[in-house]
């Protein structure tokens, strides 16, 4: 009894000791765990604060990036609108330039055709000019031969002044005008008077469209009427195809003293008179027959 009781007591003591040791171990372990947990919580809290600060910075950066993205989107939309407007503007300019180029090409073609026409016309005019120069040279040779023959037949001893002739060239629209000058016949008994005659003809396409003859000279006053009649008769006699009613004759009389150095003339001697005869014929009148041309 006593042994079993003793063993029970010993067992109870050991159990108490074990329980106490377990409690102390548990308490120490718990305390260590609490300390470790507290340290870990502190670290976690610091990490949390750092994470919160980092999150705050990230949120700030995100907000800044969001604003920048919106600004870039606005810039993108503006650039797209500007690009679209530029495309439309340059498209319109391109269309205008294409129209201008097309017009210039047409104008260039017209200019080329005009140049070709002008070259053809120039060639035709050049050929016509050469032909007319040949005809003029032929007429000049004929006139020179006629003048040589006419003045060679005049008897010597009388002081004669050679009639003057003039040749003037001019252009009428769409035609080439050739002017031919020749001297008309002077009555034999007035050959000692100073008389000059000039006849001008304007020829269009081989037809005479305008003709004028002018003769003037200084004669004695008493012979004015006689000279005028002689000139008129000689003119129509030399040109039988003309009719008096188709020709306009005009006589201009000018008083002119033969001796200009004298201030006064004698009363018994009348001063000489300058007489000018002008004939004009329109295109409706038959043309004067030209002399036949021979080489």
From Swiss-Prot:
UniProt keyword Coiled coil present: yes
Positions in coiled-coil regions: 1-151
Residue ranges of domain IF rod in the record: 1-150
Protein name: Keratin-like protein KRT222
Keyword Coiled coil: yes
InterPro entries named among the record's database cross-references: IF_conserved, IF_Keratin-like, IF_rod_dom, Keratin_I
Keywords: Coiled coil, Intermediate filament, Keratin
One GO molecular-function entry: structural molecule activity
Gene Ontology cellular component annotations, sorted alphabetically: intermediate filament
Domain of life: Eukaryota
Record-linked Pfam families: Filament (PF00038)
Family to which this protein belongs: Belongs to the intermediate filament family.
């Amino acid at each position: 009894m006593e042994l079993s009781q003793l063993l029970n007591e010993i067992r109870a003591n050991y159990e108490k000791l074990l329980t106490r040791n377990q409690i102390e171990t548990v308490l120490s372990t718990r305390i260590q765990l609490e300390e470790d947990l507290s340290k870990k919580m502190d670290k976690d809290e610091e990490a949390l604060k750092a994470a919160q600060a980092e999150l705050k910075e990230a949120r700030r950066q995100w907000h800044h990036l969001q604003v920048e993205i919106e600004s870039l989107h606005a810039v993108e939309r503006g650039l797209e609108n500007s690009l679209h407007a530029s495309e439309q503007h340059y498209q319109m300019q391109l269309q205008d330039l294409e129209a201008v180029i097309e017009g210039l090409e047409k104008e260039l073609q017209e200019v080329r055709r005009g140049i070709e026409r002008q070259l053809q016309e120039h060639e035709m005019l050049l050929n016509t000019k050469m032909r007319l120069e040949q005809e003029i040279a032929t007429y000049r040779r004929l006139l020179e031969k006629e003048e040589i023959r006419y003045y060679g037949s005049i008897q010597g001893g009388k002081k004669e002044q050679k009639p003057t002739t003039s040749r003037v060239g001019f252009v009428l629209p769409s035609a080439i005008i050739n002017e031919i000058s020749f001297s008309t016949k002077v009555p034999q008994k007035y050959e000692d008077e100073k008389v000059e005659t000039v006849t001008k003809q304007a020829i269009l396409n081989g037809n005479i469209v305008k003709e004028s003859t002018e003769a003037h000279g200084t004669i004695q006053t008493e012979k004015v009427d006689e000279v005028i009649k002689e000139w008129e008769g000689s003119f129509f006699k030399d040109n039988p195809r003309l009719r008096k009613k188709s020709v306009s004759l005009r006589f201009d009389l000018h008083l002119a003293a033969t001796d200009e150095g004298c201030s006064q003339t004698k009363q018994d001697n009348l001063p000489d008179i300058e007489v000018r005869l002008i004939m004009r014929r329109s295109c409706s009148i038959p043309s004067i027959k030209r002399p036949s041309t021979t080489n």
